[in-house]
């Protein structure tokens, strides 16, 4: 918690020109009344569900149990639905956020918040930037940062202020200096800061509790809206390093670090979650949680673009969550954590074996990535040409740089999908490549 609370009551200041103009779709706004008892709808242009050729969907899980979606549940999945998501799934995800981030009930007076389901968190981010950022605005990010976000931001001709990081993420002193010495005659003062606090992509850094408090305090002081993009939140390893290998172990309390949302006293955090890393990336289910006023604008934008996330994907997730309950969900998260911890350790072993003394890196405590600093001035040609010739795929640091005109010594390696043997062979090939480069 910060010493002083600067509670936000009016979010107009944070909206882009387009965001301020966003209005509800007249037809979509009627959806909320369609389920009222006795309501006869002649308003919506919904296709008649009796014409759909699907009778039921059956999915077998890896533990042998089954999900069956049929009847009214299947009809709901295949029909147009409210933009924020299927109501029962939206409630289940709100319950998850309350449980995991210690949130108040969503309708508590003065603290009203909401949750909107989207086609993956990438869509949520794009929607948020649409209603928050104007062309030629300033925005603060970590440097390096997620390439997918840069792909959204760079075409807007923004002043992207990349703040240096250390092993715990964005350095507060660097952020404080940037804001306190801002030249208002050159650039618009930023309203938004974008952060990836856990298992940062690409650097693998994770903010500890004090770092989050320090960053939050500065954002409160300078009235910045925080975009907390946290797809690797459930891939934190510290709670798994001493866990038993029993995949049936009870995990009633996941030992995960406090999120920025959980410490938000001002109402300045928009949190973005994803099920891609923990259930399935192909389901394309993400969700954004935050102040009701801001989410209303995001909802209006989504009404005019994709309408809503896939009803079928939502129905599958809802059926799974209902079958699992809290305990089984926690067990699955614990399994995911142990799985990626083992993959990380496999890569660390191969680095110690083949790359010792050749690269610099920090051991990640969350996520899927290791960020190497190489003994070369620019990794781009080395990776795009030489590494490809040796049949190893890595990503050069320039792909994640807020300033792509400057060379980068860094490379991102992912340990998520390759086997132990493939990881070892790839790291060996990479070491051979570096040794050859250093001999030139």
Swiss-Prot record:
<dbReference type="GO" id="GO:0008793">
    <property type="term" value="F:aromatic-amino-acid transaminase activity"/>
</dbReference>
<keyword id="KW-0663">Pyridoxal phosphate</keyword>
<keyword id="KW-0963">Cytoplasm</keyword>
<dbReference type="InterPro" id="IPR004839">
    <property type="entry name" value="Aminotransferase_I/II_large"/>
</dbReference>
<dbReference type="GO" id="GO:0030170">
    <property type="term" value="F:pyridoxal phosphate binding"/>
</dbReference>
<dbReference type="InterPro" id="IPR015424">
    <property type="entry name" value="PyrdxlP-dep_Trfase"/>
</dbReference>
<comment type="function">
    <text>Has aromatic amino acid transaminase activity.</text>
</comment>
<dbReference type="InterPro" id="IPR015421">
    <property type="entry name" value="PyrdxlP-dep_Trfase_major"/>
</dbReference>
<feature type="modified residue" description="N6-(pyridoxal phosphate)lysine">
    <location>
        <position position="277"/>
    </location>
</feature>
<comment type="similarity">
    <text>Belongs to the class-I pyridoxal-phosphate-dependent aminotransferase family.</text>
</comment>
<dbReference type="GO" id="GO:0008483">
    <property type="term" value="F:transaminase activity"/>
</dbReference>
<dbReference type="Pfam" id="PF00155">
    <property type="entry name" value="Aminotran_1_2"/>
</dbReference>
<dbReference type="InterPro" id="IPR050859">
    <property type="entry name" value="Class-I_PLP-dep_aminotransf"/>
</dbReference>
<keyword id="KW-0032">Aminotransferase</keyword>
<keyword id="KW-0808">Transferase</keyword>
<dbReference type="GO" id="GO:0005737">
    <property type="term" value="C:cytoplasm"/>
</dbReference>
<dbReference type="GO" id="GO:0009058">
    <property type="term" value="P:biosynthetic process"/>
</dbReference>
<dbReference type="GO" id="GO:1901605">
    <property type="term" value="P:alpha-amino acid metabolic process"/>
</dbReference>
<protein>
    <recommendedName>
        <fullName>Aromatic amino acid aminotransferase DDB_G0287711</fullName>
        <ecNumber>2.6.1.57</ecNumber>
    </recommendedName>
</protein>
């Amino acid at each position: 918690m910060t010493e002083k609370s600067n509670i936000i009551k009016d979010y107009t200041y944070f909206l882009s020109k387009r965001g301020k103009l966003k209005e509800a779709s007249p037809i979509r706004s009627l959806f909320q009344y369609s389920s009222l008892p006795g309501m006869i709808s002649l308003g919506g242009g919904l296709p008649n569900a009796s014409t759909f050729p699907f009778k039921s969907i059956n999915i077998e899980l890896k533990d042998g149990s089954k999900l069956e979606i049929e009847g009214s549940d299947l009809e709901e999945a295949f029909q147009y639905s409210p933009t924020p998501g299927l109501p029962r799934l939206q409630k289940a995800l709100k319950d998850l956020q309350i449980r995991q981030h210690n949130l108040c009930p969503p309708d508590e007076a003065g603290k009203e918040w909401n949750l909107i389901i989207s086609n993956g968190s990438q869509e949520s981010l794009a929607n948020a930037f649409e209603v928050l950022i104007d062309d030629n605005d300033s925005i603060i990010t970590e440097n390096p940062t997620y390439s997918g976000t840069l792909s959204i931001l760079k075409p807007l001709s923004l002043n992207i202020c990349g703040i240096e990081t250390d092993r715990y993420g964005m350095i507060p002193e660097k952020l404080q200096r940037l804001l306190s010495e801002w030249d208002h005659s050159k650039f618009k003062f930023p309203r938004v800061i974008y952060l990836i606090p856990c298992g940062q992509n690409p650097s693998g850094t994770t903010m500890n509790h004090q770092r989050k408090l320090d960053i939050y305090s500065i954002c409160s002081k300078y009235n910045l809206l925080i975009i907390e993009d946290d797809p690797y939140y459930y891939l934190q390893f510290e709670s798994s390093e001493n866990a038993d290998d029993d995949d049936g172990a009870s995990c009633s309390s996941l030992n995960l670090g406090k999120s920025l949302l959980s410490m938000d006293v001002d109402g300045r955090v928009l949190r973005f979650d994803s099920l891609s890393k923990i259930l399935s990336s192909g389901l394309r289910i993400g969700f954004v949680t935050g102040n009701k006023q801001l989410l209303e604008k995001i909802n209006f934008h989504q009404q005019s673009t994709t309408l809503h996330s896939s009803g079928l994907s939502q129905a599958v997730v809802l059926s799974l969550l209902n079958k699992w309950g809290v305990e089984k969900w926690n067990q699955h998260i614990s399994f995911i954590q142990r799985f990626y911890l083992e993959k990380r350790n496999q890569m660390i072993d191969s680095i110690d074996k083949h790359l010792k003394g050749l690269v610099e890196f920090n051991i990640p405590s969350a996520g899927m990535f290791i960020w190497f600093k190489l003994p070369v001035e620019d990794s781009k040609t080395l990776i795009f040409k030489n590494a490809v010739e040796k049949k190893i795929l890595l990503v050069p640091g320039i792909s994640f740089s807020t300033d792509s005109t400057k060379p980068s010594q860094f490379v991102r390696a992912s340990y998520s999908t390759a086997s132990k043997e493939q990881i070892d062979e790839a790291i060996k090939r990479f070491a051979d490549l570096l040794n050859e480069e250093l001999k030139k």
